[in-house]
């Protein structure tokens, strides 16, 4: 009996830790992106660093689509329908304020889904197009956090390049 109690207490603590740490990771990345992108002009966020490179605007569309589909849609049940190719080819050049609002709203949706996870939910089966080998929700949240970190790094680089170009 005591062993079961200790195990349940540990799992509850683990659940609290997972929720807290995932929320922190997603918020930190979003805050970094916002702080870097806010000083830029609309023209700058749609500037290609080289002919085949992604713009900051396209990366924001991509991150919004990725998180909206894999977490808000597949786990949260939002019904989001993704058009991944458009994330990289959209020519509408939405204003920076619109992109940041969409991205920020998506981060808030992701955090709301994270906070709803119970101890059992983390190990619930997860499959989605592109994540067929994922296995469980924990791995889906982890992959999406890693993906967000990867593209946050790209945005950091692009912002530094734009800053250097503006000094020349």
Model regions and ranges:
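Generic structural signal for secondary-structure transition and capping sites
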Residues: 31, 42-45, 68, 108, ...
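Short, contiguous alpha-helical
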Residues: 5-8, 19, 23-27, 34, ...
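Active-site rim elements
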Residues: 16-23, 93-97
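Hydrophobic alpha-helical core bundles mediating ligand binding, dimerization, or RNAP-core interactions
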Residues: 26, 30, 37, 103, ...
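N-terminal intrinsically disordered/low-complexity leader segments
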Residues: 10-14
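Acidic/histidine-rich alpha-helical segments that form the ligand environment
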Residues: 91-125, 136-147
